Curated annotation (Swiss-Prot):
It catalyses: N(2)-formyl-N(1)-(5-phospho-beta-D-ribosyl)glycinamide + L-glutamine + ATP + H2O = 2-formamido-N(1)-(5-O-phospho-beta-D-ribosyl)acetamidine + L-glutamate + ADP + phosphate + H(+). It comes from Bradyrhizobium sp. (strain BTAi1 / ATCC BAA-1182). One of its GO terms (biological process) is 'de novo' IMP biosynthetic process. Pathway: Purine metabolism; IMP biosynthesis via de novo pathway; 5-amino-1-(5-phospho-D-ribosyl)imidazole from N(2)-formyl-N(1)-(5-phospho-D-ribosyl)glycinamide: step 1/2. The keyword Transmembrane helix does not apply. ATP binds at residues 51, 90, 492, 529. Belongs to the FGAMS family. Monomer. Part of the FGAM synthase complex composed of 1 PurL, 1 PurQ and 2 PurS subunits. Mg(2+) 2 binds at residues 116, 267. It is found in: Cytoplasm. This is Phosphoribosylformylglycinamidine synthase subunit PurL. The gene is purL. Substrate binds at residues 93-96, 115, 239, 311-313, 532. Coiled coil: none annotated.
Length: 735
């Protein structure tokens, strides 16, 4: 065997393995591992690939429903939408690389999630993202926003998939660890889904796509450790993406799938060739022999260690039907991509890697994954925070000035500056563009549409992880409902700090319990996801951020609702109960200067009952516009509806039973705003009363201003100018 470094405790630690984990390796293989084997174990046993801190808790998630074709465990989740069609989708993080090298980190995050989708045999039709940045005044924030947004747009636009929605937030807790969560959605034939499990002995294992370089080595390990002041030095571990190569890879993969060449397929993502080969073999209960001399490389003198751990982008591994090998090769050559037989399946259940005639690794394949450490880490529940009583909160300004301030804050202002850099209409199927509750994308040339959203409220999750987890799912369910969609399933991206700290693990466990309970109550299963831990720098963790990506179905996309008021003279109805909950509200934080209190409680039965009623109104054509209530509460939602349409509203005063600023800006859950024609208002209100659904008329659309009885009014154009100005001004250098 070639000269390799001697295995020392320092080398083991540098690979992110704890002493007890290394002892486990020694016991498992009965000898000291080679350097290449140490790298393989480091890749397969890190947090990013093994889920060793989270797996025990993830098992409790509801993952089944009659429409679920494939739940967690594959490259992406798959749901049946009827007519022989399936939706394939997943969300993943690229947090650590995006902080170090924002443009490349974001591009490869998009590229990786697109590969997860088309690996399953689906053509990508939409992307979304959830972005969390540090405080605007932090010296790195502008640079990170600029790089990440350019990277997402650069990759998606070049690849040719629309970016149709997302979330962006700013908070000082993300100063040292931004979050870049990318979601991709694709369409496939329900009976032509491709999986990762290899089958058959002595089947050719084929390397496809771009050449292997030294970029991304230990990328997965970097994503499994917290940052410190030396993190900038990790720039070489950030992968480099090429969207044009990925587009060629997509077309070549779909073509050989259509030609019935494929037994199994796995994209080379985290841990590259190592993870893809091990997963294919282990899932098929087979061994894998690899000959690295056959791997196409773009750099000279690459070692076995480097080739096995490279995370170069735009690469796939396939097990092909032997009789189809020549046909498959011709297809890939036509698209100008590398095609190389790099190994074979074996009955040995061992993972054997050869290079230059030497055996560089010989390991039990199933144990690489199945025997990874599994931790039930100590966790403590977050302390309960006191309920903030609205009558004890002094209003620092009048209602309309408070609204003007809120809509120009970093979290509530328009994100047009971001989404206008994304091509959100390419492919020609985008029905509802960014800026509303959920994006709506047409399903091919038929009448169906998909409702797509990404949601989470991290400040709620910090204050009460259980309620915050429930609320993230409930808001995704509401956003899909508000456009007329029937919520079908979610993908989650669970972003947390260091799980070795009991309080952080407590946040994770609490959020997961809330997510599980909400998914069960709303019949909204989890079909795919990703866990990103160690999101902290120098011991300062991010806010717990379990991003929820939701997918819903519209049988007729023309019967969707938008947030824009449709006409003047229509009745504005508030559906759901309003108590004026100010705890953890944006108003309390950004107007009153208090980030405190318990978040609003989530009533899942009310969410289901009220959401079903609103969806029925949209389908019946009764509702002319609809909007769910979330950040900023009632008046911010009304302002958004007015700004989207250019039509004002005349609003009744707050009821005497609720403090005015709590009524207008409280963030009670399970609420919607709906407009109906004046001729329908009485009938709808009577029907709601009969059904026991809280529903109140709060005003009438019309005019050019938002006017509250007994308060000042403000022109909609004035609001829109403030709403649209903050982000472009900030990115242009304004304080």
């Amino acid at each position: 065997m070639r000269n390799e470094p001697q295995i020392t405790p320092d080398l083991v630690a540098a690979h992110g393995l704890k002493p007890d984990e290394y002892e486990r390796i020694l016991k498992l293989i009965g000898r000291v591992p080679t350097f290449t084997e140490l790298g393989i174990f480091s890749a397969m046993w890190n947090e990013h690939c093994s889920y060793k801190s989270s797996r025990i808790h993830l098992r409790g998630l509801p993952t089944k429903a009659p429409w679920v074709i494939q739940g967690p465990g594959e490259n992406a989740g798959v749901i049946d939408i009827g007519d022989g069609q399936a939706v394939v989708f997943k969300m993943e993080s690229h947090n650590h690389p995006s902080y170090i090298e924002p443009y490349q980190g974001a591009t490869t995050g998009v590229g990786g999630i697109l590969r997860d989708v088309f690996t399953m045999g689906a053509r990508p039709i939409a992307c979304l993202n959830a972005l969390s940045f540090g405080a605007p005044e932090h010296p790195k924030t502008r640079h990170l926003v600029s790089g990440v947004v350019a990277g997402i747009g650069g990759y998606g636009n070049s690849f040719g998939v629309p970016t149709v929605g997302g979330q962006t937030r700013f908070h000082t807790r993300y100063d040292g660890n931004i979050l870049v969560n990318a979601m991709a959605v694709g369409l496939a034939d329900a009976d032509k889904i491709f999986y990762a499990a290899a089958s058959g002995v002595n089947m050719p294992i084929v390397y496809l796509g771009s050449k292997t370089g030294r970029d991304g080595i230990h990328g997965a390990s970097m994503a499994s450790a917290e940052f410190d002041d030396s993190s900038e030095e990790k720039r070489p571990t950030v992968q480099v993406g090429d969207p044009f190569a990925e587009k060629l890879l997509l077309e070549a993969c779909l073509e050989i799938m259509a030609a019935d060449c494929v037994i199994a397929i796995q994209d080379m993502g985290a841990a590259g060739l190592t993870c893809s080969a091990v997963e294919m073999g282990a899932k098929g209960d087979l061994g894998v022999d690899l000959d690295l001399d056959a791997v196409p490389t773009r750099e000279t003198g690459m070692s076995a260690y480097e080739m096995m751990l490279s995370e170069s982008q735009e690469r796939m591994l396939m097990v092909l039907k032997p009789e189809k090998e020549k046909e498959a090769e011709a297809i890939f050559r036509k698209w100008g991509l590398d095609f190389a037989v790099v190994g074979y399946t074996t009955p040995s259940k061992r993972f054997v890697v050869k290079h230059g005639g030497d055996v560089m690794a010989d390991l039990p394949i199933k144990e690489l994954g199945d025997e990874a450490p599994l931790y039930d880490r100590p966790h403590v529940a977050s302390p309960a925070l006191p309920v903030i009583h609205a009558r004890e909160v002094k209003a620092p300004m009048d209602i309309i000035p408070a609204l003007e301030k809120l809509i120009a804050t970093p979290d509530l202002c328009s994100k047009r500056w971001i989404w206008e850099q994304y091509d959100h209409v390419i492919l020609g199927n985008t029905v509802q563009r960014p800026g509303g509750d959920a994006a709506v994308v047409r399903v091919q040339d038929g009448p169906k549409g998909l409702a797509l959203t990404v949601d989470v409220t991290p400040r709620y999750c910090e204050a009460d992880p259980y309620q915050g987890g429930m609320q993230a799912v409930a808001e995704a369910w509401r956003n899909i409902t508000a456009v007329g969609g029937r919520p079908l399933a979610i993908t989650d991206n669970l972003n947390f700090g260091n799980p070795e700290r009991p309080e952080i693990m407590g946040q994770f466990v609490g959020c997961l319990k809330g997510i599980s309970e909400a998914c069960r109550a709303l019949d909204f299963p989890v079909v795919s996801g990703n866990v990103s831990l160690y999101n902290e720098t120098n011991g300062r963790a991010i806010l717990p951020t379990p991003s929820i990506g939701g997918v819903g179905l519209l049988d007729d996309f023309t019967k969707s609702a938008s947030i824009a008021f449709e006409a003047e003279g229509e009745a504005i109805l508030l559906i759901g109960e309003t108590h004026g909950w100010l705890g953890q509200s944006v108003y309390l934080r950004d107007v009153c200067g208090r980030e405190e209190g318990a978040p609003p409680p989530v009533d899942l039965a009310a969410e289901k009952r009220i959401g079903d009623v609103v969806r029925g109104m949209i389908h019946a054509g009764t509702a002319t516009a609809a909007h769910d209530l979330s950040d900023g509460g009632l008046l911010v939602a009304l302002a958004e509806m007015a700004m989207a349409s250019g039509i004002g509203a005349r609003l009744l005063a707050a009821p005497a039973s609720i403090v005015p600023h709590a009524y207008w800006f409280g963030e009670d859950q399970a609420r919607y705003l709906v407009t109906v024609p004046e001729t329908e208002a009485g009938r709808v209100l009577a029907k709601m009363r009969g059904a026991g659904v809280p529903c109140t008329r709060i005003g009438t659309t019309g005019g050019s201003a938002l006017a509250i009885a007994g308060e000042a009014s403000v022109e909609v154009t004035t609001l829109k100018t403030r709403f649209e100005s903050w982000l472009p001004g900030y990115m242009g250098g304004a304080a």
